[in-house]
């Protein structure tokens, strides 16, 4: 609804229309088609025109000659009744002015003659009844104003006349009990106090059944709140204090069994919390302190047998975490510190046999890592430093034979030794970073079948009995590749690997097949000493 009112007083050369006993009318302005645009009714004080007459009504016309509005005038300002019409002659507004200001009840109509709105004024301000209508002429919003502010009842209806909301205002802000509907079904109830939510709060589903019950205090959630579902009734329960979770907390599964129970303190999880599966069996138990996991936590298979037991400190795993098979036997033990794997760990099969054992440091593998086959036979050993292979890595066959030995530094290979089941060499690879700089290959019988490489020459000598004593490959007069030393009876005593004259690996044996000491980058700042028990320095 919009309205615009004009009060026009024009002084000049007037055209008088004398219609006998009717009030005299004076045309003030005409359209270019000769029809009047503005006119006035006046009252003659003595005789003559101008100062001898006063305007008592202003009239405006449409171009088609139909009246637009009439406004009564007193004391040279709008005073009295006001009427207006649409160009078709259908009334559009009715009201009155007092001393130039809107006053009392005003009504507006649409072009079809149906009501559009009603307003009530006092001294130009909204004061009293206020109504908006739909285009079908039915009320839409009904309320009251006091001195331009909503004050009192409020009602909103849909186009079919059904309630949408009911409440009240005080000083232009919501106050008191409010209710909302949709298609005649109540959807929400809320109580206000001077614009703040204060008191019971209810939400209903599409069937009108309760969905949420709670309350507010000073615009903040307070006390017990309940959530409901059609299938199971009470769905969850939470206690608030000053808009924060504070107290008991419960959630239920669709079948009515509990899903979660716990406690809040000032909005933070506290004390023991429990989770349950749909059968009502315990799923997990955790302890909280001021919102952080702190203490023992247990995860279950079926409410009785633990699946995992662990400890938290300041919301981070700390100490030993143990996992179990369904029969209760240990599956793994892992040590944590400040949320990271740090310390010893091991994995076992369902029969209690070791599968893997080692240690972590700040989340990375560090130290010796052992792995087993399903039996008690080792499958591999490896040394790590801060998550990278460092030192010796060995791989064994199920029968216990060494099948592979790898020497690593900072995660990169230095040399790889591969063996046949009978213990003889199968292949030796020398590396510079990830690049292979030499490869030696043997048949299972012990015969070398290496493909000759360009630029590589070999120096060697033998014992007096004809057995090999020494052999080394060179590149550009520098030792490059493998250097061998054998005893008189072909027992390997040492093996060195060079990279263009630089010694990168030194291996020695105290007896045939018995390693003594291995050294990576001997004599250099990054030297790594590997003893017969595969311990790196």
State what each model feature region is:
Residues 1-7:
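Bacterial N-terminal signal peptides that target proteins for export
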Residues 7-18:
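Bacterial N-terminal signal peptides
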Residues 18-537:
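Glycine/tyrosine- and acidic-biased, solvent-exposed loop/turn segments at the edges of beta-strands
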